[in-house]
């Protein structure tokens, strides 16, 4: 895989307040440049949700209402996040969730495409059986020594997802092959289905 052929790509992870639909509490966006996660130009935002953080959500990511009380409201940072994401490709683990939540919070935003490391892992490791982020970290053993934060925080999970993407991408020869394996049907960037040549 020649990483120089990749378009602009941000690995994203979001954490919510636990309601349905969720209010965002944390967003991370980590660029991949030359086959490496670039923490020096990453975007990271904490935001105070409109509704309280549920106890379950706090048990997952560790963020409480007290932690977020002095953080800006989403309306104050949405423009910055929108500008940062731009029209780059994004990647996430179980990307339907992150894409759907971000799209709901960023009207008018549309990435060039969406890579899903969950879908990619199923294509790359069909024998694995389970494809949670923890299971893939255990199986692939990516270098997480420079991962910021802790598991289930957006910055850590984005970094881990980036390292998993890079490791799995090395098994594909071209960007187009990676896209075919990693973009879920119906999401931006999905390859067009081949037309039946007998139809006109």
How does the language model describe each region?
Residues 117, 139, 181:
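Short acidic/histidine-centered micro-motifs embedded in hydrophobic/aromatic stretches
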């Amino acid at each position: 895989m020649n990483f120089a052929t990749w378009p602009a790509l941000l690995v994203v992870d979001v954490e919510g307040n636990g309601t349905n639909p969720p209010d965002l509490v944390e967003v991370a966006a980590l660029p991949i440049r030359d086959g490496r996660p670039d923490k020096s130009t990453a975007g990271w935002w904490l935001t105070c949700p409109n509704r309280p953080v549920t106890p379950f959500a706090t048990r997952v990511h560790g963020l409480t209402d007290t932690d977020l009380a002095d953080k800006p409201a989403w309306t104050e940072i949405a423009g910055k996040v929108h500008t940062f994401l731009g029209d780059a490709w994004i990647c996430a683990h179980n990307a339907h969730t992150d894409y759907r939540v971000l799209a709901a919070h960023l009207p008018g935003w549309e990435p060039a495409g969406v890579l899903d490391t969950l879908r990619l892992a199923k294509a790359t490791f069909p024998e694995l059986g389970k494809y949670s982020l923890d299971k893939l970290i255990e199986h692939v053993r990516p270098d997480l020594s420079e991962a910021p934060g802790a598991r289930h925080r957006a910055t850590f999970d984005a970094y881990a997802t980036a390292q998993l993407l890079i490791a799995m991408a090395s098994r594909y020869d071209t960007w187009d092959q990676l896209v075919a394996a990693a973009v879920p049907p119906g999401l931006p960037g999905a390859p067009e289905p081949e037309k039946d040549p007998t139809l006109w």
